[in-house]
């Protein structure tokens, strides 16, 4: 099922999914020429191989626990914690527990 992107000025619900997390999938919430916001939904143990994004990013853990591997070590994020990565910074992601997060991507590279 395709998810609709929110329009400018529209309120987006980002509360924890709780027991319903396993029924949800990763999807873009907002996408514009300069910015993309994605709700990451990661079952426990799910990993994203090392990759990089041209622009800067932030990852805000909404629920659960996520490891972000950057600069050779893991940074553990719990609910309410955020990490910023510079443009082109190689990183990998792994869900320690079932988790959801808000990924913000600046699509305009420096």
Language model segments and positions:
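Conserved short histidine dyad/triad with adjacent acidic residue
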Residues: 23, 36-53
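Short, conserved beta-strand element in jelly-roll/cupin
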Residues: 41, 52-67
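A short, N-terminal "cap"/entry segment at the start of jelly-roll beta-barrel domains
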Residues: 1-34, 69
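A cytosolic small-molecule/anion-sensing beta-strand core signal
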Residues: 62-63, 78-79, 97
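Ligand-binding loop in jelly-roll beta-barrel domains
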Residues: 87-110
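Short acidic-glycine-tyrosine-enriched beta hairpin
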Residues: 72-87
